[in-house]
Amino acid sequence: MQQLNPSEISELIRARIAGFEGRVETRSQGTIISLSDGILRIHGLEDVMYGEMLELPGGRFGLAMNLEQDNVGAVVLGEFSGLQEGDVVKCTGRVMQVPIGKALLGRVVNALGQPVDGKGAIDAEEFDVLEKIAPGVIDRQSVDEPMQTGIKSIDAMVPIGRGQRELIIGDRQTGKTAVAVDAILNQKGKDVQCIYVAIGQKASTVAGVVRKLEEYGAMEYTTVIAANASESAAMQYLAPYAGCTMGEYFRDRGMNALIVYDDLTKQAWAYRQISLLLRRPPGREAYPGDVFYLHSRLLERAARVNADFVEKFTKGEVKGKTGSLTALPIIETQAGDVSAFVPTNVISITDGQIYLETDLFNAGIRPAINAGLSVSRVGGAAQTKIIKKLGGGIRLDLAQYRELAAFAQFASDLDEITRKQIERGKRVTELLKQDQFSPMSVAEQGAALFAASSGALDDVEVANVRPFEKALLAYLNSNNKELMAGIEEKKDLTDDLKKQLDAAVKQFKSGSTY
């Protein structure tokens, strides 16, 4: 038997010591000293980060939001019953993360990315942080591709481009969600992934939206993030950031995504509630001083990024493709007051707004878009050529018509030009009405706008404008399929297509009843 001498034994011990890996995990921990309204005060967390996830008893988590000299203020994510003073809280060493990837499409999740639709666990590709810095100026590409909503009045008067932030603003019950949902439905077959973030809404309302998305086959390319009215303020505050992170997955990989925040007023309310409970000093309308930053850091992440950014992000896997994340934030006003704190903040952050008016909605003009107050600051460069040619004067016509119509109430005798303008305005107003859940293709919008601009509607009774439009589109789709396909493909009205369309409209008028 071979004997080991003492020097060999000491060498073996040294080698073992050198190869030893310490598995000692040091984590700061503290105790809850007060608990009320979902807000924790924790003593003893020495090295906690701002925004760090905290491990609470019972497998729950909190979020560190106030770092003070002698304690840490944190919000509980989810249910806080069962927690009590003296409970131990541990640091996790990581910030908030949510699952991202294509596995989330077709699912309904909460603000933490956990499924709430009863369809089982989500096999996510990876996780990413909630709070991210928006792409810089050098990484961005100008907005020049259209994001078609399928709504005539929007695509003609306030066009939206891919990578734009277009605010939808109006009082309650003016059709804000309807506009956003129609925009999602219109992305079918256009290779645009959609995210719908419901903040502070009734569970029944969210269920209704999900049902409609499923009914029209839109759920297969859509993720719904629900932070319902019954959930904690912390979840309502975090939901938009979670949705944005999920949308950035597509943007950064050279794909296109559309995100709807419904609505950011409720997020601002939730943040105000959290801030006041954390004893942060209140400012105007009791909002904290950083409520502008709350929305600006969220909406700046919606952008169109250039091919270099995508190539660098994907480490050369995707080349020559730009990515975009288009945002449609919704803001609810009180009695039409767009000069309130949160509405003015979001108007100044976004690239334009679609203003929906209660009076127009009640008058049966739906979508109830106020042409004078609605604007798109960058979408004009992204508008399709045919809509630009045919719909260019519509916004001006409508604004002038509303002005003249108000003036005509007091004047008994009107000159011929004014009377014609009013008559045309009535027909254009009627033409721009559109049923919910019925987005239109570019060719259909082009044909309808062509009928208005060419004077084909001038001899049609105002009450018959919508039946005329419906019958015309049905006629063109069945008898002039090649013409409609040509317009849809070129997105332009060439001289040849214009002649064909003019002839088709005249032929329809000569032989049809509507």
UniProtKB/Swiss-Prot annotation:
Protein name: ATP synthase subunit alpha
Gene: atpA
Record keywords, A-Z: ATP synthesis, ATP-binding, Cell inner membrane, Cell membrane, CF(1), Hydrogen ion transport, Ion transport, Membrane, Nucleotide-binding, Translocase, Transport
Topology versus the membrane: Peripheral membrane protein
PROSITE patterns tied to this protein: ATPASE_ALPHA_BETA
Record function comment: Produces ATP from ADP in the presence of a proton gradient across the membrane. The alpha chain is a regulatory subunit.
Family stated for the protein in its record: Belongs to the ATPase alpha/beta chains family.
Keyword field contains GTP-binding: no
Subunit structure: F-type ATPases have 2 components, CF(1) - the catalytic core - and CF(0) - the membrane proton channel. CF(1) has five subunits: alpha(3), beta(3), gamma(1), delta(1), epsilon(1). CF(0) has three main subunits: a(1), b(2) and c(9-12). The alpha and beta chains form an alternating ring which encloses part of the gamma chain. CF(1) is attached to CF(0) by a central stalk formed by the gamma and epsilon chains, while a peripheral stalk is formed by the delta and b chains.
GO cellular component: plasma membrane; proton-transporting ATP synthase complex
Residue positions binding ATP: 170-177
SUPFAM superfamilies given in the database record: C-terminal domain of alpha and beta subunits of F1 ATP synthase (SSF47917), N-terminal domain of alpha and beta subunits of F1 ATP synthase (SSF50615), P-loop containing nucleoside triphosphate hydrolases (SSF52540)
UniProt cross-references to HAMAP family, sorted A to Z: ATP_synth_alpha_bact
